[in-house]
Structure formats: C-alpha cells, structure tokens
C-alpha cells in the first residue's frame, strides 16, 4: 500500500482486502457528521490494521460471460457479453474530477448540500454545506472510504459479423475458402455504480504490480 491506503494481509480475510481511513459511524452503521456538516474520520472501526480500517475488497462477487454465435446462410454473427458484479476500487481519477468540479455530477454549485448521516447527539444531519466542501472538502480531503467505489460493470466485449464467400466464386482462384469479417471490441460498458459524468471504466483501474484495484 501507499499513503493511508493499500492492500493488507489480514487473518481470515481475502488477500484483496483494502485498508484506509474510514468514515466514523454509529453502532448501527450510520455515518457520523461533525459540527461543520462534514463526515468524521474514524480509523478504529471494523478491522483495525496499522491504525486503518477495512474499506473494501477488490475481489468481485462473481464474473459471468455470455457468448453466442448465430449463422444464417453464409453470414455469421458472434458476440461476447461480460458482467463483473461486485468488488471495490479506489479511484484518484474520479476523486479529482468530482473534487475539482470537472464533471456534470457537480452541477448547481450554488445549491446547499446536506450529507446523509447523523450528528453526535444521534439526530439526523441538518447541517448545510456548499458544493466545494461537499466534493473537495470531503471527497479529496476526507476519509479514504469516500474515494472507494463499487467496481461492478456490464460490458459488450466483442461483436463480429462474418460473410463466407461462396466457393463457386473461388473456382478460378487459388483459394479454397475466403471470408470477410468486421469486428469490434469493447463497444459498450456501464459501470452503473460510479458517478455517471466520470465515464469511468473499471477495466483501466490498477495499482501496478499487486492485488489492488
């Protein structure tokens, strides 16, 4: 790992466990909000490892692939659809876009925000904060947990259309068979649990050599 976050080998947990600073929470899991209206940071919750908490697991719940081929006459249509469900990722890219106001997710900058959670007395949070505090003050400066997203993604990985040239057309050629194909790769994806305006593709995420995401 690096900074305040990274992977950790924790007894009884997957090797893909991610640790970092976390949002302070009540005993029933509600986020704790401080007097200024921002999230509190609590490093002593969940699994304490080197003063940091468990903030995610990069291992997906499951991966499914659907491949099919349809042939009619001399024409063949093939596709490969992939679904990766679950797993967490830490993204400095999305953090920067949101924190710096570079995505449509941060429009209406003059509107006040009220973060979901409770105050120290247990009452629902009613503290209003501005756009900059919401995204920069919490997402960039706040706990690592806020920069961790679900990495689920649906993807149309491959599509191909092939035409087999009739053999009679090749009688006067040295070729016994010929085909013409058009192929496309990574034509569509939807990382449906990431901010829409970031257009983020979890497949490009990585921390170099290691087991992070």
Predicted regions and their residues:
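Flexible, surface-exposed loop regions and adjacent strand-edge segments
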Residues: 1-2, 94-103, 193-205
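Hydrophobic, lipid-facing positions within transmembrane beta-strands of outer-membrane proteins
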Residues: 62-68, 75, 156-161, 213
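Extracytoplasmic gating/loop element in the C-terminal half of outer-membrane beta-barrel translocons
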Residues: 15-17, 86-175, 179, 184-185
């Amino acid at each position: 790992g690096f900074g305040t976050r990274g992977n950790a080998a924790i007894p009884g947990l997957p090797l893909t466990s991610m640790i970092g600073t976390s949002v302070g929470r009540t005993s029933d899991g509600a986020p704790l909000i401080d007097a200024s209206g921002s999230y509190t940071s609590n490093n002593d919750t969940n699994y304490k490892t080197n003063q940091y908490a468990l903030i995610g697991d990069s291992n997906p719940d499951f991966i499914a692939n659907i491949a099919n081929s349809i042939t009619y006459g001399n024409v063949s249509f093939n596709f490969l659809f992939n679904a990766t469900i679950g797993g967490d990722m830490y993204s400095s890219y999305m953090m920067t876009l949101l924190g710096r106001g570079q995505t449509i997710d941060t429009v209406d900058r003059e509107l006040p925000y009220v973060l979901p959670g409770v105050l120290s007395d247990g009452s629902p949070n009613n503290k209003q904060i501005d756009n900059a505090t919401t995204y920069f003050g919490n997402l960039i400066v706040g706990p690592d947990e806020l920069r961790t997203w679900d990495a689920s993604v649906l993807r149309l990985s491959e599509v191909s259309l092939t035409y087999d040239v009739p053999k009679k057309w090749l009688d006067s050629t040295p070729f016994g068979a010929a085909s013409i194909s058009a192929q496309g790769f990574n034509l569509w994806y939807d990382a449906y649990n990431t901010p829409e305006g970031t257009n983020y593709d979890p497949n490009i995420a990585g921390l170099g050599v290691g087991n992070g995401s």
